[in-house]
Regions:
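Flavin-binding catalytic cores
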Residues: 227-257, 277, 299-320
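C-terminal helical "tail/cap" subdomain of flavin- and related membrane-associated enzymes
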Residues: 302-405
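Short hydrophobic core segments
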Residues: 16-18, 41, 147-160, 276-281
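N-terminal FAD cofactor-binding segment of flavoenzymes
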Residues: 30-83, 102
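Short FAD-binding loop at a beta-strand-to-alpha-helix junction that anchors the flavin cofactor
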Residues: 209, 271-289
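FAD-binding beta-loop-beta segment adjacent to the flavin cofactor pocket
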Residues: 198-204, 259-278, 333-339, 346-350
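N-terminal Rossmann-like FAD-binding beta1-loop-alpha1 element of flavoenzymes
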Residues: 5-40
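Predominantly flavin-linked oxidoreductase catalytic cores and closely associated redox partners
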Residues: 30, 110-251, 264-267
Length: 405
């Protein structure tokens, strides 16, 4: 079924998925494929419905969501503050871009073909346990209350506040989709990090360039720091980057996107009740050291669907303990200024094969590979930070904002 009129008809689904972002769509798709009855609750049109977003990830071969991939790149590049270039083909991996609108249309078309799936437009207010499952209390677009029931509920809505943590940085960015008057981009190469931009007093900043054609690209200015900028400050940084650094010449900004992604060593609870689970960024699927989320969401969705198909409900951790420990050390080292961010990332990609770095960031590396990666970082500052972390208390700060990349 496609998006349908809400009707509290006494239906009890095996699963209710709250939120129609990457995590909710992926899980609804996986559950439907596993033969699990599912209702996907999406926000109605209006201020609660998120704007078009860009999600990127790397993958080998052809994925099952290839129809929603708008571009992919065979070669990846990192530029140091001095212009030093590290460029590599991380075969068999390719870097891919998905636009949220295309992804939503693709998943909706697949859900429409299933008699066990439905998509409801409603505003979810409360999720709570109930006898033999859980309930989602909603309001329909015309203002009527609606209670949805499921044996299990998977909630992807952003958490109200970041859980207790020792370190919290924000990855915040604004990007322009630009069209230039001359063919200035190489569609085969994506710039993951370009540190030739002025660096902030605290944290780090870089450019991010994803060419879509010789004369079109997504160009972003990104910072890892404690506070986001104003829109005018992002615009100024983008003007400087496109004119003074990239020297793109005359261009037209066709659209823009902006977001904030928490980078933290907080532990996000994945189960909040006997039948209620958190998924996606709300369930810890954002990689703390990078802000990437989409690939982990897919892994998590596959595992949940496989477990439910066997009659069990689990939401596995998106990343292993070693990866989380290494990320916690890096975040603290960046936040304290013990390591120079631009130099750290430039040297990491220069000293470690790019395919190995990407596998590590996707939680696919071996302990020996991770040991080797650790030896190619500033050992002294990182070791000092690792020894300090167990003695630091976790604290709670303000609201968590999420716009996963």
């Amino acid at each position: 079924m496609g998006p349908s009129d809400p009707d509290d008809d006494g239906r009890v689904d095996e699963a209710v998925v709250v939120g129609g972002g990457a995590a909710g769509l992926c899980l609804a798709h996986r559950l439907t494929g596993a033969g699990v009855g599912v209702t996907l609750v999406e926000a109605p049109d209006g201020p609660l419905r998120p704007a078009e977003r860009t999600w990127c990830f790397w993958e080998a071969g052809t994925g099952e969501f290839e129809e929603a991939v708008v571009a992919n790149w065979r070669r990846l590049r990192v530029r140091g503050p001095d212009g030093h270039v590290v460029e590599s083909d991380p075969a068999p991996l390719r870097y891919r871009m998905v636009r949220s609108g295309a992804f939503e249309r693709l998943v909706h078309s697949r859900l429409e073909a299933s008699p066990t799936a439905r998509v409801l437009r409603a505003t979810a207010h409360e999720v709570r346990d109930a006898p033999d499952g859980a309930q989602v209390h909603c309001t329909t677009p015309d203002g009527r209350p609606l209670a949805l029931r499921g044996r299990y509920v998977f909630d992807s809505r952003p958490v109200r506040a970041t859980p207790p943590h020792r370190t919290l940085l924000l990855q915040h960015f604004r990007g322009w989709f630009v069209r230039t008057s001359a063919p200035v981009f190489d569609p085969e190469v994506a710039d993951l990090m370009d540190f030739r931009v002025p660096q902030p007093r605290h944290g780090l900043a870089f450019g991010y360039v994803l060419p879509l054609a010789p004369d079109r690209a997504l160009v972003e200015y990104t910072e890892f720091s404690r506070s986001p900028l104003t829109t005018s400050a992002y615009e100024s940084a983008l003007r400087h980057y496109t004119t003074k650094v990239l020297r793109l010449g005359p261009l037209t900004v066709e659209s823009a996107e902006q977001g904030v992604i928490p980078m933290t060593d907080a532990v996000f609870p994945r189960r909040t009740g006997p039948a209620v689970f958190r998924i996606g960024a709300a369930g810890g699927a954002t990689r703390p050291a990078t802000g990437y989320t989409f690939a982990a969401v897919q892994r998590q969705s596959r595992a949940i669907a496989a477990a439910l198909g066997r009659g069990r409900a689990i939401v596995p951790p998106p990343y292993g303990r070693r990866a989380m420990a290494m990320d916690a050390v890096l975040l603290r080292a960046l936040d304290t200024g013990r390591v120079d961010g631009p130099r750290f990332f430039t040297d990491l990609f220069r000293r470690v094969p790019m395919d190995r770095v990407l596998r590590f960031l996707d939680d696919g590396s071996t302990p020996w590979e991770e040991f080797g990666i650790g030896l190619r970082t500033p050992v002294g500052p990182m070791l000092r930070t690792a020894l300090e972390l167990p003695f630091l208390s976790r604290r709670t700060t303000g609201r968590s904002e999420e716009s996963p990349r």
